[in-house]
């Protein structure tokens, strides 16, 4: 009887733990980024002789859509990148560029990511685009049903990847208006494979006010 009670108790505890892991109760809440915070981020080009510049250059004239990639080798990140790339013809029509930032360069990970993301990619060494407060998902991600659903969807879409590089710091997607227009959309991953809604991205992009030479001087 005692062993039976212990067994039932253990199963019950495991069930409760599984239930709690699949709520958002224990997920760290993202803190919204201010435009001034993003503007001051130092980015590097990925050339042999890299150029360092302030991130605001990316959106100053025409706004921008920016993906903060959790890990280029992750098949879930590659699936989200492909989602964003499906918007590229419409973004080009609207005159809004699409960029990505990565937090590290590991082997050929960035090069191997480029078939899924054909926009320009920059290095954010200080991981500022992943802040202001970096959020991590550790092994709890392995028992979240949402992660399993996201994984199945990506696998079913034919995406594959590897385990190279840091992948616990969660990424996101930003739509930023031109000049001082501000952040029009800020999507922060709450779990692995939590993709932004492409329609939400397009809706935000349509609000961008492109700067003409005259408005840029005003």
From Swiss-Prot:
Record GO cellular component, one term: extracellular region
Residue ranges the record marks as coiled coil: none
Active-site feature positions: 74, 77
Disulfide bridge positions per record: none
Keywords (A to Z) from UniProt: Antioxidant, Cytoplasm, Redox-active center, Secreted
Tissue-by-tissue expression: Expressed in kidney, liver, skin, and brain. Widely expressed with highest levels detected in adipose tissue.
SUPFAM superfamilies according to UniProt: Thioredoxin-like
One Pfam family it belongs to: AhpC-TSA_2
UniProt subcellular location: Cytoplasm; Secreted
Location of region: Thioredoxin-like fold: 3-101
Gene3D superfamilies referenced in this protein's UniProt entry, alphabetically: Glutaredoxin (3.40.30.10)
Cytoplasm listed as a keyword: yes
One GO molecular-function entry: antioxidant activity
Primary location: cytoplasm
Misc. remarks from the entry: The active site cysteines correspond to the redox-active cysteines of peroxiredoxins.
The protein's role, per its UniProt record: Involved in redox regulation of the cell. Acts as an antioxidant. Inhibits TNFSF11-induced NFKB1 and JUN activation and osteoclast differentiation. May affect bone resorption and help to maintain bone mass. Acts as a negative regulator of macrophage-mediated inflammation by inhibiting macrophage production of inflammatory cytokines, probably through suppression of the MAPK signaling pathway.
Family to which this protein belongs: Belongs to the peroxiredoxin-like PRXL2 family. PRXL2A subfamily.
Name the record gives this protein: Peroxiredoxin-like 2A
């Amino acid at each position: 009887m005692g062993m039976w009670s212990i067994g039932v108790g253990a199963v019950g505890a495991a069930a409760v733990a599984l239930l709690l892991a699949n709520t958002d109760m224990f997920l760290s809440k993202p803190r919204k980024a201010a435009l001034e915070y993003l503007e001051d981020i130092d980015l590097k080009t990925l050339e042999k002789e890299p150029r360092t510049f302030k991130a605001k250059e990316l959106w100053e004239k025409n706004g921008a859509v920016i993906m903060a990639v959790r890990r280029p080798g992750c098949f879930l990140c590659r699936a989200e990148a492909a989602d964003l790339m499906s918007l590229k013809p419409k973004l080009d029509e609207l005159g809004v560029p699409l960029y990505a930032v990565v937090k590290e360069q590991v082997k050929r990970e960035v090069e191997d990511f480029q078939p899924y993301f054909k926009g320009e990619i920059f290095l954010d060494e200080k991981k500022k685009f992943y802040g202001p407060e970096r959020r991590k998902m550790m092994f709890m991600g392995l028992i979240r049903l949402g992660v399993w659903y996201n994984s199945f969807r990506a696998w079913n879409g034919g995406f594959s990847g590897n385990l190279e590089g840091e992948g616990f710091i969660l990424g996101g997607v930003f739509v930023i208006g031109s000049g001082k227009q501000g952040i029009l959309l800020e999507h922060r991953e709450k779990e692995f494979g939590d993709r932004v809604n492409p329609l939400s991205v397009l809706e935000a992009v349509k609000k961008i006010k492109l700067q003409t030479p005259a408005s840029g001087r005003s």
